[in-house]
A protein has these predicted regions:
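Conserved N-terminal glycine-rich FAD pyrophosphate-binding loop of Rossmann-like flavoproteins
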Residues: 49-72, 99-112
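Short, solvent-exposed loop/turn and secondary-structure capping segments
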Residues: 53-57, 105, 110-112, 120-121, ...
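Conserved redox-cofactor binding core of oxidoreductases
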Residues: 68, 73, 80, 84-92, ...
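FAD cofactor-binding and catalytic pocket of flavoenzymes
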Residues: 84-98, 102-105, 109, 115, ...
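Short, hydrophobic/aromatic-rich segments at coil-to-beta transitions
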Residues: 266-272, 410
Length: 446
């Protein structure tokens, strides 16, 4: 982490900066760093607080029940969900789980850091069209993107080892892979026995000191938690310190953006937001970069509709918010006679990517990877909220005994798969539900 002095300016909201960046996560943090270090004036608008390493604790109840690092849909930030457009969306947990703090979800995610393969960029050309989908090639190739993958690897800090199915890379990982933990050993043994090729998982967690940050202390509180020693390579501890030290970047926290305004010729002029006390501010900017994740970005574009842009900004195609794609997820949990203690250390240390591209003769599309981990992210509270052993007791001493067994003797094997782009899977504005600021709630149809 850059330990330079925070030399950030304070820009008047009524004077246009070169760039207003909405969001400080994986995209926003990098964008702010690149722009500010190139000499541009930048204001970052972040909806959450600026938490430091000392703020990150092992409080399982706060994290897993109260969603301390996320927007809690139960407390002023509702989301609605429906499976088809013929249904009425209902308020609930829609699976849009993202952090609200400086660094965004790069602060609380598991650290898995897989590269796409060459085929992923040209798959439509190779496989042909898929009826009923908007399946197309990327406008760039893996070869064009590879230098930037490597730049990210080294600047934020990754640990790993080139695997047998990995695409070409111009430089090795900056840090060696994490030591293998018990779920990784189980996956490795089973995969090799079946003829597959497991290898060390690439993770955005430091196995050794890098760029002034320490290596992992293997506390086990990664998935859903911020890192108490800054070994997890979030943009909050990698990119943003450099941006703020440039003298060209101002970070404003707890700013809830409501809309993006344009002038008579359709050019963006300002971002309107509320401060924590409800004061409305309009920050003028020559350009606006939306880095508010795959849900909040379309929400802001749709909320910025005007007479000139009746369907929202940048939506002449009608595609804003459509073709929503999730990480397909299948989990098998094994309960072992002997203790596994899978909750220790980082979530994942071994992966199997033999199934990244499947045999088309199987009759369906897509592939993915497999990893092994603790089924409840190493959190006893999460295991308890999950009900303990399947079909087992749910109260009393027998329940506590079964919960201890589940927590210490279980291991999950998790499949991460592709999903197809369908216009019917989308993020739109709910016409009937609003958040605490009066903004239309995010409505997920999937």
């Amino acid at each position: 982490m850059a330990q330079a002095l925070d030399n950030s300016p304070s820009y008047p909201s009524g004077e246009a900066v070169d760039f207003a960046v909405v969001g400080s996560g994986s995209a926003g943090g990098i964008m702010a760093k690149e722009l500010s270090m190139a000499g541009f004036s930048v204001v970052i608008l972040e909806q959450g607080p600026h938490l430091q390493a000392a703020d990150f604790t092992h409080d399982e109840w706060s994290i897993k029940h109260n969603f301390e690092l996320e927007w809690d849909w139960r407390k002023g930030h509702p989301q609605t969900f429906r499976r088809t457009e013929n249904e009425t969306a209902v308020v609930g947990d829609s699976s849009l789980r993202y952090a609200h703090n400086v660094g965004g979800s790069s602060v609380h995610y598991s650290g898995n850091f897989w590269r796409l393969r060459e085929i992923d960029f040209i798959e439509a050309s190779v496989r042909g069209p898929i009826a009923g989908t908007n399946f197309v090639d990327w406008p760039i190739t893996y070869a064009e993107l590879e230098p930037y993958y490597t730049k990210v690897d080294w600047e934020i800090g990754l640990s790993g080892l080139q695997g047998p199915w990995d695409p070409p890379r111009s430089r090795d990982y900056p840090c060696p892979p994490m030591p293998v933990k018990s779920p990784g050993v189980l996956l490795e043994r089973a995969a090799k026995k079946l003829g597959y090729t497991p290898y060390p998982a690439p993770v955005a967690i430091l196995s050794q000191p890098h760029n002034g940050r320490p290596g992992c202390i293997h506390c086990g509180f990664c998935n859903g938690y911020g890192c108490e020693v800054n070994a997890k390579s979030s943009t909050a501890v990698t990119m943003l310190p450099l941006a703020l030290a440039s003298g060209n970047c101002e970070l404003r926290t707890e700013c809830t953006v409501s809309r993006i305004n344009t002038n008579a010729v359709g050019r963006v002029t300002e971002v309107v937001y509320w401060e924590a006390d409800g004061t409305e501010v309009a920050q003028r900017a020559n350009a606006v970069v939306l880095c508010a994740n795959g849900a909040e970005t379309p929400r802001l574009l749709l909320m910025s509709a005007t007479g000139s842009f009746p369907d929202g900004l940048a939506n002449s195609s009608g595609m804003v918010g459509k073709n929503l794609m999730f990480n397909g997820y299948t989990q098998v949990i094994g309960l072992f006679d002997e203790p596994i203690h899978a909750y220790k250390s980082v979530p994942v240390t071994r992966v199997v990517h033999d199934f990244w591209t499947l045999d088309e003769s199987l009759g369906f599309y897509g592939g993915g990877g497999i990893d092994s981990r603790h089924p409840y992210g190493g959190n006893l509270i999460a295991a308890g909220l999950g009900g303990g052993l399947f079909g087992g007791p749910s109260w009393g001493s027998d329940y506590k005994r079964s919960l201890r067994q589940l927590f210490t003797h279980s291991c999950s094997f998790d499949g991460h798969t592709t999903s197809l782009p369908l216009a019917s899977n989308n993020v739109t504005l709910d016409p009937n539900v609003q958040d605490m600021w009066g903004r239309p709630a995010i409505r997920v149809t999937y």
